[in-house]
Amino acid sequence: MRIGEWMRGLLLCAGLMMCGVVHADISTVPDETYDALKLDRGKATPKETYEALVKRYKDPAHGAGKGTMGDYWEPIAISIYMDPNTFYKPPVSPKEVAERKDCVECHSDETPVWVRAWKRSTHANLDKIRNLKSDDPLYYKKGKLEEVENNLRSMGKLGEKETLKEVGCIDCHVDVNKKDKADHTKDIRMPTADTCGTCHLREFAERESERDTMVWPNGQWPAGRPSHALDYTANIETTVWAAMPQREVAEGCTMCHTNQNKCDNCHTRHEFSAAESRKPEACATCHSGVDHNNWEAYTMSKHGKLAEMNRDKWNWEVRLKDAFSKGGQNAPTCAACHMEYEGEYTHNITRKTRWANYPFVPGIAENITSDWSEARLDSWVLTCTQCHSERFARSYLDLMDKGTLEGLAKYQEANAIVHKMYEDGTLTGQKTNRPNPPEPEKPGFGIFTQLFWSKGNNPASLELKVLEMAENNLAKMHVGLAHVNPGGWTYTEGWGPMNRAYVEIQDEYTKMQELSALQARVNKLEGKQTSLLDLKGTGEKISLGGLGGGMLLAGALALIGWRKRKQTRA
């Protein structure tokens, strides 16, 4: 070994002994993630952990980029903000080369609200965190800051004894702790989840662990889904999203499927408030509406009403772990229930998922009593028993499961009827006016595409009705049950609307059968070389099936009478 190499090795060892090696054994990140990344959780440094996470995060084979249907669509102007890693390019103006303070000065004039929000943020006030006293309920933030600085030292972005002065524009939009100037037309980036993960490694790793723990026993959903970690992948791998030419409509879906790409859906820029993200309203923008009305169901539940009535008395700044004990919280919130897993609070919100919102997905209901599902049910019981007895919790969760299965059975009966019509070729226009959907979608019955694309009689009205019964009404029934909103699964939403859809489907099916019987009767009569207008026998004047047959028969009899009168006069 050469002397120079030997000296460098000696100095490195000495440095490590002096400052100690920081390991990233993050207790809230499950073993499955360390295994998937091929890391030893007891030895991996923050740098090694971060690099392994980012390598997977940016790998097209693991969901990055345009996806497998990328040839069928092109980004529009707004797309650069939906998936910055793939599409964002720095602006061509202003042609400025600026340092840290210049960003704030310029944007105070150009985008003043951004700057005001940032000045209120923890990012802009790190010394306030350092000065917190141990009896302050926010004291935990001091430990978080120290963890962030240790991460940055491991990554070589902060000196051994250096502290982070602030997190300003240049840190997120160029590079953390950048000392020199940046070219506005070359160096600017739009922050993505891995940008935030540079400092917030724990939270990034927790969120990314959804890929490893959301694995269904029989492949009911693709691995890692549904989740925040792969919600953009789920979006662009949806056939109709890639197929539809109305790209502005498609990007409406994207706007709620960008948690994979960035963190500001929950932590709004440029304040990035943890307190804001703990409030139920932070979830409402996306977890609402006709196919997943979680917000509506929660707010109309007793849980939601308690939160609404008492929220002004709660300290939203305390960490979730302390919300009930130190923050005055006395009712569940979205975060309190869904971010909790067996006593820990993390950004992995899928470890208790059992129904995944859509009970009609093949294999979901069949799996609900499996050991996999029962273990997750037990984890939910632990969540619920923070406020309820175990007997009550298990009783209610049993009601939820069985109520969902009852709704599923109602849908399945209706779906079987419409599917038979499809197989028989008797849906409206099925043989005469049913254009194929745009590529890459393939023709089929009751496919998700038909909620967002239509042409001619594709889909038929009954086909769309039973599809909405599954995607919307059954989903809302389950959500109402899961969020303890009685009207949300019995009357206003769920069972009531499903019952109406069922009745309408049965009505149309019966009319179709009667019309078919009428057609068969007419065909039979024509086969006797007898015109319908020449009916004479009483047996041939019987009802031919429903209103249509009756009207046709009445018209025929009137014409027969007219012919007889004409013959008599002649």
UniProtKB/Swiss-Prot annotation:
<feature type="binding site" description="covalent">
    <location>
        <position position="256"/>
    </location>
    <ligand>
        <name>heme c 4</name>
    </ligand>
</feature>
<dbReference type="Pfam" id="PF13447">
    <property type="entry name" value="Multi-haem_cyto"/>
</dbReference>
<feature type="binding site" description="covalent">
    <location>
        <position position="196"/>
    </location>
    <ligand>
        <name>heme c 3</name>
    </ligand>
</feature>
<dbReference type="GO" id="GO:0016491">
    <property type="term" value="F:oxidoreductase activity"/>
</dbReference>
<feature type="binding site" description="covalent; ligand shared between tetrameric partners">
    <location>
        <position position="491"/>
    </location>
    <ligand>
        <name>heme c 4</name>
    </ligand>
</feature>
<feature type="binding site" description="axial binding residue">
    <location>
        <position position="388"/>
    </location>
    <ligand>
        <name>heme c 8</name>
    </ligand>
</feature>
<feature type="binding site" description="covalent">
    <location>
        <position position="253"/>
    </location>
    <ligand>
        <name>heme c 4</name>
    </ligand>
</feature>
<feature type="binding site" description="covalent">
    <location>
        <position position="387"/>
    </location>
    <ligand>
        <name>heme c 8</name>
    </ligand>
</feature>
<keyword id="KW-0349">Heme</keyword>
<comment type="subunit">
    <text>Homotrimer; subunits are linked by two covalent bonds between Tyr-491 of one subunit and heme P460 of an adjacent subunit.</text>
</comment>
<feature type="binding site" description="axial binding residue">
    <location>
        <position position="200"/>
    </location>
    <ligand>
        <name>heme c 3</name>
    </ligand>
</feature>
<feature type="binding site" description="axial binding residue">
    <location>
        <position position="123"/>
    </location>
    <ligand>
        <name>heme c 3</name>
    </ligand>
</feature>
<feature type="binding site" description="covalent">
    <location>
        <position position="384"/>
    </location>
    <ligand>
        <name>heme c 8</name>
    </ligand>
</feature>
<feature type="binding site" description="covalent">
    <location>
        <position position="169"/>
    </location>
    <ligand>
        <name>heme c 2</name>
    </ligand>
</feature>
<dbReference type="GO" id="GO:0019331">
    <property type="term" value="P:anaerobic respiration, using ammonium as electron donor"/>
</dbReference>
<feature type="binding site" description="covalent">
    <location>
        <position position="286"/>
    </location>
    <ligand>
        <name>heme c 6</name>
    </ligand>
</feature>
<feature type="binding site" description="covalent">
    <location>
        <position position="283"/>
    </location>
    <ligand>
        <name>heme c 6</name>
    </ligand>
</feature>
<feature type="binding site" description="covalent">
    <location>
        <position position="172"/>
    </location>
    <ligand>
        <name>heme c 2</name>
    </ligand>
</feature>
<keyword id="KW-0560">Oxidoreductase</keyword>
<feature type="binding site" description="axial binding residue">
    <location>
        <position position="347"/>
    </location>
    <ligand>
        <name>heme c 5</name>
    </ligand>
</feature>
<feature type="binding site" description="covalent">
    <location>
        <position position="199"/>
    </location>
    <ligand>
        <name>heme c 3</name>
    </ligand>
</feature>
<dbReference type="GO" id="GO:0070207">
    <property type="term" value="P:protein homotrimerization"/>
</dbReference>
<feature type="binding site" description="axial binding residue">
    <location>
        <position position="257"/>
    </location>
    <ligand>
        <name>heme c 4</name>
    </ligand>
</feature>
<dbReference type="GO" id="GO:0047991">
    <property type="term" value="F:hydroxylamine oxidase activity"/>
</dbReference>
<dbReference type="GO" id="GO:0033740">
    <property type="term" value="F:hydroxylamine oxidoreductase activity"/>
</dbReference>
<comment type="function">
    <text>Catalyzes the oxidation of hydroxylamine to nitrite. The electrons released in the reaction are partitioned to ammonium monooxygenase and to the respiratory chain. The immediate acceptor of electrons from HAO is cytochrome c-554.</text>
</comment>
<feature type="binding site" description="covalent">
    <location>
        <position position="266"/>
    </location>
    <ligand>
        <name>heme c 5</name>
    </ligand>
</feature>
<feature type="binding site" description="axial binding residue">
    <location>
        <position position="303"/>
    </location>
    <ligand>
        <name>heme c 8</name>
    </ligand>
</feature>
<dbReference type="GO" id="GO:0042802">
    <property type="term" value="F:identical protein binding"/>
</dbReference>
<feature type="signal peptide">
    <location>
        <begin position="1"/>
        <end position="24"/>
    </location>
</feature>
<dbReference type="GO" id="GO:0020037">
    <property type="term" value="F:heme binding"/>
</dbReference>
<feature type="binding site" description="covalent">
    <location>
        <position position="334"/>
    </location>
    <ligand>
        <name>heme c 7</name>
    </ligand>
</feature>
<feature type="binding site" description="axial binding residue">
    <location>
        <position position="228"/>
    </location>
    <ligand>
        <name>heme c 6</name>
    </ligand>
</feature>
<feature type="binding site" description="axial binding residue">
    <location>
        <position position="173"/>
    </location>
    <ligand>
        <name>heme c 2</name>
    </ligand>
</feature>
<feature type="binding site" description="covalent">
    <location>
        <position position="263"/>
    </location>
    <ligand>
        <name>heme c 5</name>
    </ligand>
</feature>
<keyword id="KW-0479">Metal-binding</keyword>
<keyword id="KW-0732">Signal</keyword>
<dbReference type="InterPro" id="IPR036280">
    <property type="entry name" value="Multihaem_cyt_sf"/>
</dbReference>
<feature type="binding site">
    <location>
        <position position="292"/>
    </location>
    <ligand>
        <name>hydroxylamine</name>
    </ligand>
</feature>
<feature type="binding site" description="axial binding residue">
    <location>
        <position position="267"/>
    </location>
    <ligand>
        <name>heme c 5</name>
    </ligand>
</feature>
<feature type="binding site" description="covalent">
    <location>
        <position position="103"/>
    </location>
    <ligand>
        <name>heme c 1</name>
    </ligand>
</feature>
<dbReference type="GO" id="GO:0044222">
    <property type="term" value="C:anammoxosome"/>
</dbReference>
